[in-house]
Amino acid sequence: MNMSLDPLVTGEVSHFVGIGGIGMSGLALVLRSQGKRVSGSDLKPNLQTQRLEASGISVFYGHRAENLQGVTRLVYSSAIQPDNPELLAARRGGVAVRHRAQVLAQLAEGYRMIGVSGTHGKTTTSSLIAVMLYHCGLDPTVVVGGEVDELGGNARLGSGPHLVAEVDESDGSLVLFSPEVAVVTNIEGDHLDHYANLEQIVEAFQQYANQARVVVGCLDCQAVRDRMPLTVSYSLDGHPQADYTADRVSFTAQGTTARVLERGEVLGELSLKLLGRHNLANALAAVAVGRYLGLSFEQIAAGLREFRGAHRRFERIGERDDIVFVDDYAHHPSEVRATLAAARLQGRRVVAVFQPHRYSRSQLLLDEFGTAFGDADAVVVTEIYAAGEANTLGVSGELVARRIAAHHPDVHFEATSDSLKRHLEAHLRPGDLALFLGAGNLNRIIPELLQRAEPPALAL
């Protein structure tokens, strides 16, 4: 894939294939807000396409060559298959074809970019920074990978000089970016369908970091600590070299409080509506960015206090019969552990409902998934969400469930959506926290479960 950059062309009509995706829709919306002509296509309507259509973007449902009439540039993501009819038609017809990351990198050239990367925590950290800057009056332009209520969605065009953007490492395209500030939250083995090994992942992050003016990273991650050219650092593990640390930490069911220190000197008290240790680390990254930009700690703390969390990041969907339903995007073993640790703070019995994401990830991290659910009282596993992959590895949701069951006493596998709903309707009980985990479409059944009027039946 050619990842070179080219200048934005006046009068260009950009067509986004898969425009309803969270990353594609945000970029399309910003371009439209800049006055550029944008269209797109997707398989079916969703919240994103409805918002795009309301903004004046033409959205076609179904991928067809005729959708490209008048288009001068086609934008695609790594989720689009090579045989997509619009992609093929664009290449045959001489239409410029650009990866989403190329277009975002071009957009970034006009801003002081704050790029947030890392295996975990990108969306929450970038959203924290964006909300902080917004509440401090800096009016940033934002493109993030989740819905943020305080910003009105997953993207916005601001009038200020800053662009806050989530930088995706999954396909190697992070090397296109040269941000003013690069935040690296952590680096772990993931996306090994693209990278041969962890070393290749680290090298991609190194190239990205070397292209930044300032690199903010977490010393609690060995790969970040040992391999990133850090300018500013933060830590919750008490690393003496860290620029930003926290003590007097309190985790409750309502949120997190901590005292923040800058190079050993007390800055003040931080209060978050977010749960869990991992989110305090994300907030420290935001503090570091805010201080680099010249904000006072009082401004930073006030801005971060406003953030209620991105959608699908420990998002409370609803409650029925004293059963709380929470949706979370966690799809890597480390994310599962962190999210379950936060769930335990609620003081409820935790029932983890897990949809593995991608055959490749499930196979490569099978043993790690096996030990990731220790903080759940009960676990229900579904079939794997393919995300466009073919299953050539012989892995299945049932295999994942068996691996978890080797380390956990209460694990069930449900192969279909209907059997999963029947199981949950029969076994959830008052006082439970039903935690839906995964980056696929598992959360679609939550509204159906919330609509049940009858109280749940037998306990597990």
Swiss-Prot record:
Molecular function (Gene Ontology), one example:
UDP-N-acetylmuramate-L-alanine ligase activity
Q: What is this protein called?
A: UDP-N-acetylmuramate--L-alanine ligase
The EC code for this enzyme is: 6.3.2.8
Pfam families from the entry?
Answer: Mur_ligase (PF01225), Mur_ligase_C (PF02875), Mur_ligase_M (PF08245)
Q: Which GO terms describe its biological process?
A: cell division; cell wall organization; peptidoglycan biosynthetic process; regulation of cell shape
Q: Which UniProt keywords apply?
A: ATP-binding, Cell cycle, Cell division, Cell shape, Cell wall biogenesis/degradation, Cytoplasm, Ligase, Nucleotide-binding, Peptidoglycan synthesis
Enzymatic reactions:
UDP-N-acetyl-alpha-D-muramate + L-alanine + ATP = UDP-N-acetyl-alpha-D-muramoyl-L-alanine + ADP + phosphate + H(+)
Q: Where, subcellularly, is it found?
A: Cytoplasm
Q: Which residues does the record give as ATP binding sites?
A: G118, T119, H120, G121, K122, T123, T124
Where does it mainly reside?
A: cytoplasm
Is Amino-acid biosynthesis among this UniProt entry's keywords? no
The biological pathway it contributes to is: Cell wall biogenesis; peptidoglycan biosynthesis
